[in-house]
Amino acid sequence: MRLSGNGLRCVRGGREVFSGLDVAAESGHAVAITGPNGAGKTSLLRLLAGLLAIADGSISLEGGDPELTLPEQAHYLGHRDALKPALTVSENLSFWRDFLGGGKSGESDALAAVGLDHVAHLPAAYLSAGQRRRLSIARLLAVKRPVWLLDEPTSALDVTGQAAFAAIMTGHLAGGGIILAATHTPLGIAARELRIGGAA
């Protein structure tokens, strides 16, 4: 499987964020997208996820499911945790599993993998910032998709949480997955760097 973007141009609010940008990643490989604030790291991920319109260029996924679009084969994990405070940990994960079209199995395993199985009954409002991030990460495991597009995925995670997530990412890559992550800090896994320039 190969994900590629060629000659990408992004315009937001009438301002050109970047142009002529090429990006590529193959099965079993990760790309760390780096650069100053405002350079377009998040915008690139959102283009790949189909959440922003491409001003110019092309995006393709070779070797994926031909009956599904790239967004249908990708997880986009934004820098904000999309959780409902009144719902329990388990209910939040169930919501995302249903929304993303996942099966009924795997939820308990996903919570255990991120260390939240013991608080599955608690409302998300009671979680710490790190626990909220781990719950967001559980979505990646509850619904299997080959491409992970991650925006500052280790934000709010402590050292233990970062190590656990590195192991999760390593497992995803070992299974033939692809990871592109916008980050200011090391991911804890082998990754090729794609640096985007631009003013902060």
UniProtKB/Swiss-Prot annotation:
Reactions accelerated catalytically: heme b(in) + ATP + H2O = heme b(out) + ADP + phosphate + H(+)
Phylogenetic placement of the source organism: Bacteria, Pseudomonadati, Pseudomonadota, Alphaproteobacteria, Hyphomicrobiales
InterPro entries registered for this protein in UniProt: AAA+_ATPase, ABC_transporter-like_ATP-bd, ABC_transporter-like_CS, ABC_transptr_haem_export_CcmA, P-loop_NTPase
Enzyme Commission designation: 7.6.2.5
Family of the protein in this entry: Belongs to the ABC transporter superfamily. CcmA exporter (TC 3.A.1.107) family.
SMART domains, alphabetized: AAA
Subcellular location: Cell inner membrane
UniProt subunit comment: The complex is composed of two ATP-binding proteins (CcmA) and two transmembrane proteins (CcmB).
PROSITE patterns assigned: ABC_TRANSPORTER_1, ABC_TRANSPORTER_2, CCMA
Binding residues for ATP: G35, P36, N37, G38, A39, G40, K41, T42
Main function: Part of the ABC transporter complex CcmAB involved in the biogenesis of c-type cytochromes; once thought to export heme, this seems not to be the case, but its exact role is uncertain. Responsible for energy coupling to the transport system.
Membrane disposition: Peripheral membrane protein
Name of the protein: Cytochrome c biogenesis ATP-binding export protein CcmA
Signal peptide interval: none
UniProt source species: Nitrobacter winogradskyi (strain ATCC 25391 / DSM 10237 / CIP 104748 / NCIMB 11846 / Nb-255)
Sorted UniProt keywords: ATP-binding, Cell inner membrane, Cell membrane, Cytochrome c-type biogenesis, Membrane, Nucleotide-binding, Translocase, Transport
Keyword Nucleotide-binding: yes
One Pfam entry name: ABC_tran
Domain (ABC transporter): residue spans on this chain: 1-200
EC supergroup of this enzyme: translocase
